C-alpha cells in the first residue's frame, strides 16, 4: 500500500464525520460477511456511514457510494497471561455463579481467553493509500484534530451490535420483597450460633433456612431427584404464614439467598443485616459455607439426564469442519435461532434462493445493507455453507491451534440477522429464551413478506389442510381448506407402553414424599408414534355446532386430513401443554420417531359420493332467544358484568361465555378474553388459551374487540381507515388478489397477521365470490387476467418421507433451557450445539421437539 499524502487526506476531509450518540457504528462485523477485525484482512469502517466491510466487500461500498476514506481495524489475538492451576499448567476454568448468559458470573460461552494487539490505520480508496493512527503528527493542526477526533470517537463508540443487545439474559434478576421493610420479628428470639446448625425437625445439616420472623431453622424443599431437604421450612410457612427465610451458609457481607414463600420467589432484602442482627448474627463476619440456590440449579441443569442424552455428553464426539459444518455462537439464549437456521440452510430451496443468488442480492442491496432482509439472510447462508468460518479455533495469528479448544470453532455470530429478524417484535428483539417453533413460523412469515412474487423457498413446507365437519343430527358435511406449515402432533399419554412402570413410579414417588425419603429414579413415558398419528387423525367432537341444515345448534365431529403433502414435512411434538391449574408444563415423554414415514392414509378425499353438503348459509349472529343488548354469548340477561357498548348491536357474534369466564378467572383482561374466543371461532378453552399466550405481548392485547364494520370507542368504522399499502403488498405476494387482500385487512382492523389467518380460513368464501364475479357478467378470461388464482402455491406429491433433521429442547419450559439440532448430512448424523459441530454417535431421536422429514422420491 502507498503512503497517504497530506493532499489526499485533505481531499476527503469534508466526508469524515465524528459519530454522534444516535449513530450506529458497525465496527465488529462486515455488513456482507462475517469478517471481523480479527479476520486476515481486518475490517474497513467507512468514516462517513460507519458501516464495516471486509477486504472482499469494501470496494463494493466505494463503488456504490463514492465514499473513499475508511478506518482499517485489525486485531491479532494472543493468549492471556494467567495464573495456572497447581501442577497442571492449565489456567483455572471459571465456574458459573449466576444462572445467566452473557453477564458477569454467568455462563460465558465465548470466554475471553485472549488479549489483542490492535493495528489502526486510515485508508483512502481506490489506491489504498494509508497512514497509521500515530502518524498524524506532521499534518496541519486543523486536519490532525479533525481526523483524530473521528478516529478516537469511532474506537470508543459502542458498536451497533452492543447497542442492539437490549440486555443479557439473567435468570436470577431478583426483586425487593414486599415484606422487606415491614417484616414482623418476634420478641426475645433465640441467639443463632455462627455455625453447627441442624434442622429442628430432622437431622439434616445442609440446605437449612432461617425463618426471619421467629428464628426457626428448618430444611428446604425436596428436589425432583430426591435430593435437597424434607420440606420442613415450607411446611412451617404454611402453618405460621411467616414469609421470609434466609439460607444459612450463603450469608456473606455482600448478601445471601433470601426466599419469600408468600411471593414464591427468590427476593432481595435490603434490611437483611438488621433482620439478622435480631438473632445475633453479624452479617459482616459471616462466610459462605453452602451452595447458593443458583449454584444448585446450575449443577442440576448440567447433570440432568435429558441434557446429557440430547447433547450426547460423556461420549467423545469427532469435531467436523468445512462447508456445511459451521457452528453459530450463542449470543445470549439464541440457541433457538441457531438450531432453526442450521436446518433451513440444509434445505436446497433455501440454498438456491439466498446462497446461489448471493451476488445478485448483494448488488441490489440498499446503501445500508444491515437493514435489508435478503442481504442478511444471504450473508447468513453463505457464512454457514462456505466453510470460510468453519475452522478450528486458533491461538494466534501464526496459525497455532489452541490445544484445549481443538473441538471448538470460532463459527459465526449472526448479530445483524438477529437484530433485523427481531426488530419490532416484543419477544425476538430480546435476549430471552424463545420457543423454536414460534421462531420458525416467525421466520417463515418474514420470508413470505420479503419474497413478494419471486421464488419462495417456503413452498417446501406449505401444505393444505382439509377439515371435514359432519353434523351428527343430519349426517350432512362441510369441507374447508386452510394453509399450514407445521403438523402439530398430540401426545396421548394414555397410550404409553410402560403404564405399569409409570403407575409404580407414581406410587413410589407418593410414598417417598409421605415418608420424606429420596424419590425413586425417574421413569419416562414411552408413547408409540403410531398412537400420536392416530390421535391426530381421530374425529373430534364439536359441541354447540350451528347446523345450517337444522338452523339450530347441534353436535358435530371434525376430522383433519392433508389436502396436499409438502416436500418437507415439519412435525412438532406437542410436549408443552397446560396443567389443570393452567400452569405451562412439559411432558416428559419418549417417542421413537421412525426413520421412514408414510402418512398416505391421512390424505383427504374431499366430498364423497353419497355425502350431502350442509347448506352454505351464514349462521345468525345472535340466537333467537337472546335478550336484546347482550354480548351475543350463549347466556342470559343476568350476565350484566359482561355488557359492553361495543357489543350492543344485534349483529354481535355468538361467543362462548363459559370459555371467557374461564380465561377471566385466570387473570386475563376481559377484552383480551373476548378476542381470544372470537378469533379462535368458539373452538374451546385450549384454543383460546393458546391464542392468549401467543398474543400477550401485542400492543392492542387488552383493547376492546372491534368487529368489521363496527366503530371503536371514539373512532369511526375500521373500514374508514384504508389498509396500509405494505400490508396489501405482502398478502398479494402470497398469491391472493388485491381485492382479497383489502377485504381481509378490513375484516381484521388492518392487522396483517390476523388478515393472513382470516384469508386462509375464508378460502371457500373467496372462491364463491370469484365465481359470483363471473356470473354477474365478467367472462372467465377477464376474471383470470385481472386477478391472481385464489390461494397460495403449494406443492404436492406422495406422502412418503425420510427423517432428515430434528431440533431438541432441554429444560422444563420453552422460556428456559437449551436447544440443539441434529441433521443428517452425507449419510451420517451431525449434532449442531451452537459453536460445537460434531459427528453424532447416538442421536436421541426419541426426545426431539420439532422433526423435519424429506419426501422420498421413487
UniProtKB/Swiss-Prot annotation:
Keyword Nuclease part of the UniProt annotation: no
Active site per UniProt: 335 (nucleophile), 818 (proton acceptor)
InterPro entries reported in the protein's UniProt record: Papain-like_cys_pep_sf, Peptidase_C19_UCH, Ub_carboxyl-term_hydrolase, UBA, UBA-like_sf, Ubiquitinyl_hydrolase, UBP13_Znf-UBP_var, UBP5_UBA1
Cited Pfam families: UBA_7, UCH, zf-UBP, zf-UBP_var
Residues bearing the modification Phosphothreonine: 292, 623
SMART domains: UBA (SM00165), ZnF_UBP (SM00290)
Keyword Oxidoreductase in record: no
USP domain span: 326-856
Disordered: annotated segments: 73-98
Subcellular location: Cytoplasm; Cytoplasm, Stress granule; Nucleus
EC number: 3.4.19.12
Source domain of life: Eukaryota
Protein modification: SUMOylated at Lys-113; SUMOylation affects the interaction with Cav3.2 channels. Ubiquitinated by SMURF1; leading to proteasomal degradation.
Modification sites for Phosphoserine: 149, 156, 779, 783, 785
Binding-site residues for Zn(2+), renumbered to this chain: 199, 202, 219, 232
Residue numbers carrying N-acetylalanine: 2
Domain annotation UBA: ranges: 654-695, 722-762
Annotated knockout phenotype: Conditional knockout of usp5 in T-cells increases the production of effector cytokines and retards tumor growth.
The reaction(s) this protein catalyses: Thiol-dependent hydrolysis of ester, thioester, amide, peptide and isopeptide bonds formed by the C-terminal Gly of ubiquitin (a 76-residue protein attached to proteins as an intracellular targeting signal)
Function noted in UniProt: Deubiquitinating enzyme that participates in a wide range of cellular processes by specifically cleaving isopeptide bonds between ubiquitin and substrate proteins or ubiquitin itself. Affects thereby important cellular signaling pathways such as NF-kappa-B, Wnt/beta-catenin, and cytokine production by regulating ubiquitin-dependent protein degradation. Participates in the activation of the Wnt signaling pathway by promoting FOXM1 deubiquitination and stabilization that induces the recruitment of beta-catenin to Wnt target gene promoter.
Name under which the protein is recorded: Ubiquitin carboxyl-terminal hydrolase 5
Biological source species: Mus musculus (Mouse)
